[in-house]
């Protein structure tokens, strides 16, 4: 997301999409990382057309697509006005994106809840996010209470976003159990990073 040479052009996206479908093992496919469609712009491409071209094969195959967004900051690194965020979800939905993973690095629900409502208004699925870290403060109870507020605000899904891969497997497993006991119908998705070496154990714990 920070280096253009690692980002695909629209012609590459269109070529790879059918292969992802043929693999037969994905229910969801990411349409963007933590970046806006700057890469398309750098290539002189229209990002609106690029996203539509990439999502089309997945929609035909019944595979959902999802995006990442920073709540109050939308797809930027600084606050974005509410009317612009509201329009963003309508545009992304029209482009063929089904789910938006809404997060705030500080787990501040005031930065997330308005976006949940805007996404629902636009017909998207808002996946509210818990940014996972490891400290004496970041306990199962801490995260579960945030999940309660996000679900009460209308989020049908929760993402455990272990951005640095340092979430402890045992804690993550207990967190999933705690949320599921109270909200059995809420879908929980785990997002991990493999650098510190804990991610496979975390995957096993959250699945269990």
Label every PLM stretch briefly.
Residues 141-146, 150, 196-207:
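Catalytic cores of alpha/beta
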Residues 18, 27-148, 165-168:
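Active-site beta->alpha loop and helix N-cap motifs at the rims of alpha/beta catalytic domains
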Residues 21-22, 93, 151, 207:
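Non-catalytic positions within long, well-ordered alpha-helices that form the structural scaffold/packing
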Residues 1-2, 128-136, 156-168, 188, ...:
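Active-site-proximal beta-alpha loop/turn segments in soluble metabolic enzymes
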Residues 1-31, 38-39:
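Conserved N-terminal beta1-alpha1 strand-loop-helix module at the mouth
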Residues 3, 169-184, 188:
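Active-site/ligand-binding-proximal alpha/beta "capping" segment
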Residues 24-26, 97-99, 155, 185:
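A structural motif
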């Amino acid at each position: 997301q920070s280096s253009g040479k690692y980002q695909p052009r629209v012609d590459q996206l269109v070529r790879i999409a059918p292969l992802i479908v043929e693999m037969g093992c994905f229910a969801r496919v990411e349409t963007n990382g933590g970046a806006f469609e700057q890469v398309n712009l750098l290539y002189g491409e229209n990002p609106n057309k690029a996203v539509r071209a990439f999502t089309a094969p997945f929609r035909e195959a019944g595979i959902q697509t999802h995006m990442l967004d920073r709540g109050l900051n939308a797809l930027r690194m600084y606050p974005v006005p509410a009317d612009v965020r509201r329009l963003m979800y309508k545009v992304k939905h029209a482009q063929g994106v089904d789910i938006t993973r809404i997060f705030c690095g500080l787990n501040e629900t005031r930065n997330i809840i308005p976006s949940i409502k805007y996404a629902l208004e636009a017909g998207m699925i808002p996946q509210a996010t818990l940014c996972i870290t490891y400290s004496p403060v970041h306990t199962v109870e801490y995260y579960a209470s945030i999940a309660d507020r996000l679900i009460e605000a209308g989020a049908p899904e929760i993402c455990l976003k272990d951005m640095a891969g340092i979430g402890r497997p045992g804690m993550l497993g207990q967190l999933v159990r705690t949320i599921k006991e109270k909200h059995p119908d809420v879908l929980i998705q785990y997002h991990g990073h493999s650098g510190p070496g804990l991610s496979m154990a975390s995957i096993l714990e959250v699945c269990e």
